[in-house]
Curated annotation (Swiss-Prot):
Pfam hit, one: tRNA-synt_His
Quaternary structure note: Homodimer.
Family indicated by similarity: Belongs to the class-II aminoacyl-tRNA synthetase family.
Catalytic activity: tRNA(His) + L-histidine + ATP = L-histidyl-tRNA(His) + AMP + diphosphate + H(+)
Organism: Histophilus somni (strain 129Pt)
Single biological process term from Gene Ontology: histidyl-tRNA aminoacylation
Gene this protein is translated from: hisS
Protein name in the entry: Histidine--tRNA ligase
GO cellular component terms given for this protein: cytoplasm
Compartment annotation: Cytoplasm
GO terms assigned for molecular function: ATP binding; histidine-tRNA ligase activity
Taxonomic lineage from the root: Bacteria, Pseudomonadati, Pseudomonadota, Gammaproteobacteria, Pasteurellales
């Protein structure tokens, strides 16, 4: 027997049963985004490597350690580790945002070479939102309201907490960086080798260290909010006032900086304690300088991304009321001479007149017992039975597989009407 080939570590398959939950979550995401008037865009999963180096920052963990990069002839390419850079690139290239506001969203796979664990994978999926051309804090608040509405739709709102911070302008971060480095240099004995490297290259990333002893020390470190420029301070204050006015609770987390270099002013995360170490289910903020940094005209921007794997895990963990649709509504069973054609014609008629129902024709041969067993296995609600007698009498036997009404015989012409009433009840 030939040796089997397995999926790459950290890149997972999704079974038919698991896909039902994924589809349910994705449909909720799409529905909420459409409610707010956002437009879908689609970008390639492979981009030029310099795009991410320029956008995310060469000293970030994502660019320096985690990207899947390869050479194609003389061009260096990368599987996208996140969606914002590619969306900005596309918006500049196609003129979507020149003198124009845009509210865009996308959904798809991303890739990072990380140590796989629950909620963190090498291929993972994100839904992302990017808004261009709106500078005021109202749009920051709208994105947070949008996500809050989605959490309610998913049944997870009571299990997530909103954390907010402002990281100000580049100048204010540089001033804060100097103060933070001066503080941390007094505690270098507590820093790991990786953290010592960050102290030189990207000291703000030390603020989200998992080292509990260092976290305690950082409670006494200078606070970024104390170094904000006046514009960023006013922007953040107005955002907090807006959230207070609409009843969105939040925590101000002075250590929240996000892991990508393009952010400025507002940053936020929705976190949960229900998934262990991988507690962030959504994160984002403003990146007002990124469009210009990538060659476009100066354009204020804000966005977020949510991890779909973590959302699916969280829904499984806390939403016990969810009722997923079955993969099949109607299963057409047929056995005997001259039953195949009527069965196929009936199935096609149902698909034409009731396209919202999922209709499966058996196709596998075997007696009625075998076919009913298969209908039960796929979770069908109704079986439509056509035997030799039904062919002669132009009737169909309808069997409720979920234990409701007893089976009954209907004229072939009445089946669609019956199903329309029975399945919408």
């Amino acid at each position: 027997m030939a040796k089997t080939i397995q999926a790459i570590r950290g890149m997972n398959d999704c079974s038919p049963t698991e896909s039902l939950l994924w589809q349910w979550v994705e449909e909720k995401v799409r529905s909420v985004l459409q409610t707010y008037g956002y437009s879908e865009v689609r970008m390639p999963i492979v981009e030029s490597t310099p795009l991410f180096a320029r956008a995310i920052g060469e000293v970030t963990d994502v660019v320096s350690k985690e990207m899947y990069t390869f050479w194609d002839n003389d061009e260096q390419l990368t599987l996208r580790p996140e969606g914002t850079a590619g969306c900005v690139r596309a918006a500049i290239e196609h003129g979507w945002i020149y003198n124009n506001e845009q509210r865009l969203w996308y959904m798809g796979p991303m890739f990072r070479h990380e140590r796989p664990q629950k909620g963190r994978y090498r291929q993972f999926h994100q839904a992302g939102v990017e808004v261009f051309g709106i500078a005021n804090p109202e749009i920051d608040a709208e994105l947070i309201l949008l996500t809050a509405r989605l959490w309610k739709q998913l049944g997870i709102f009571d299990h997530v907490t909103l954390q907010l911070n402002s990281i100000g302008s580049l100048e204010s971060r540089q001033n804060y960086r100097s103060a933070l480095v001066e503080f941390l240099q007094q505690h270098t004995d507590l820093l790991s080798e990786e953290e010592k490297e960050r102290l030189v290259k990207n000291p703000l990333r030390i603020l989200d260290t998992k080292n509990q002893v260092l976290q305690e020390v950082l409670n006494d470190a200078p606070k970024l909010l104390d170094y904000l420029d006046q514009e960023s301070r006013e922007h953040f204050s107005q955002l907090c006032d807006l959230l207070d006015a609409v009843g969105i609770q939040y925590e101000i987390n002075p250590k929240l900086v996000r892991g990508l270099d393009y952010y400025n002013k507002t940053v936020f995360e929705w976190v949960t304690s229900a998934l262990g170490a991988q507690g962030t289910v959504c994160g984002g903020g403003r990146y007002d300088g990124l469009v210009e940094q990538l060659g476009g005209h100066a354009t204020c921007s804000v966005g977020f991304a949510m991890g779909l794997e973590r959302l699916v895990l969280l829904v499984q963990e806390v939403n016990k009321q969810i009722v997923l649709p079955s993969a099949v509504d109607i299963y057409v069973v047929y056995f005997g001479e001259k039953t195949t054609l009527p069965a196929f014609q009936l199935a096609e008629k149902i698909r034409t007149e009731l396209p919202h129902l999922r209709t499966m024709t058996h196709c596998g041969g075997g007696n009625f017992k075998k076919q009913f067993k298969r209908a039960d296995k796929v979770g069908a609600k109704f079986a439509l039975v056509i035997g030799e007698t039904e062919v002669k009498t132009q009737q169909v036997v309808v069997k409720d597989l979920l234990g409701g009404a007893e089976q009954l015989s209907l004229a072939l012409t009445d089946v669609v009407i019956y199903l329309k009433q029975a399945i919408t009840q």
